[in-house]
């Protein structure tokens, strides 16, 4: 559990998540990066960093007839998790998973190169 981390580990976890969220935002143009931690299936503490781009929001709103309503992040996450699971293709125009991973790696490397990741293990 997050509550069981000592202060140093909690601080490092926050820095790692901040750096990762920044890289995800840059790599995929996310307007938000949702941070989720359930630890239900795998009881070990871990986090899901889920990018919410404008295009993903529009796809969600079109599929759920919620255009113009306040965004419900947990419902959007669940919709995406169940819609794009099991190898189902992303909508046209979305980058591939491999391309997205490459972009995130490059963004992480760029932040480390300019000293924004020096304090993160």
Give the positions of each predicted feature.
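HIT superfamily nucleotide-processing domains
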Residues: 1-121
């Amino acid at each position: 559990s997050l509550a069981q981390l000592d202060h140093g580990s909690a601080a490092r976890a926050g820095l790692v998540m901040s750096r990762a969220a920044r890289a995800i935002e840059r790599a995929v143009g996310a307007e938000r990066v949702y941070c989720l931690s359930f630890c239900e299936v795998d009881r070990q503490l871990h986090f899901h960093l889920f990018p919410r781009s404008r295009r993903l929001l529009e796809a969600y709103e079109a599929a759920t007839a919620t255009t113009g309503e306040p965004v419900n992040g947990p419902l959007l996450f669940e919709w995406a998790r169940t819609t794009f699971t099991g190898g189902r293709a992303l909508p046209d125009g979305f980058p591939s998973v491999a391309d997205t991973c490459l972009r995130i790696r490059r963004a992480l490397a760029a932040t480390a190169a300019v000293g924004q990741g020096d304090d993160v293990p």
